[in-house]
């Protein structure tokens, strides 16, 4: 559950509560079951890095910094509070919250948001590795894979941190996939390049294969790329409307023949011209 619509749910207050915007827990369970009957898996978007700073939630829970750090790393760039992974009770809380969606609601996997902000202090490699976060994520994935080995566990991570998708038995963090943010940026940059300049930009289409086998990647054209004035995917492309339609078909063909799993934000395959508004996202 989350109080601020504009956060899209990423400023969480209730880690064990499905948002009431769509109904009650029984409604969500019915939704998952209906998806399964149609052969559709359900992957939850989980936020184990930071939480809403609201006074009626986890922040200063008992009058002290119980869940968050008591230092300059206690707050994120979004004004939220960062979880303190050096407290066992905090790690236990997050482990239990993640397990709830798999155990009670029978979801098929978990996508974990903003993992780069956990691996490094404040997401900044120059500040060093947050060893507490690494240990927490490794233990979380190990536990999830032991109890639900067929689940899909994915990291949104834009860093060069090694072994994010390596098994925990090989000292990896244990995710099944990580988002290939580099592929996404390079590909969209290439297709936004004027036609006459593209011969000098081919490296943007080939560079991803130079590092692709370092991790198990998922190619994502996500919600983050079609909001806040970034334009929809088709509107990012160079040319007239007819040329953009042809290029979009080419972009998707390239995406689906490129190694790696695939993810498209809802509506992108329908050639939406305008960005989804907050009210459409809620509806």
Question: What positions do the PLM features span?
Answer:
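Catalytic Tyr-X3-Lys helix of short-chain dehydrogenase/reductase
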Residues: 32, 141, 277
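Glycine- and acidic
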Residues: 13-16, 234-237, 278
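Generic structural signal for residues positioned in beta-strands
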Residues: 14, 82, 178, 218-220, ...
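Substrate-binding/active-site clefts of carbohydrate-active enzymes
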Residues: 1-107, 111-129
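Conserved alpha/beta catalytic core and glycan-binding cleft of carbohydrate-active enzymes
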Residues: 106-108, 120-271
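Glycine-rich, phosphate-binding/catalytic loops in enzymes
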Residues: 59-61, 170-172, 283
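Single conserved hydrophobic/aromatic residue that forms the stacking wall/gate
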Residues: 271-283
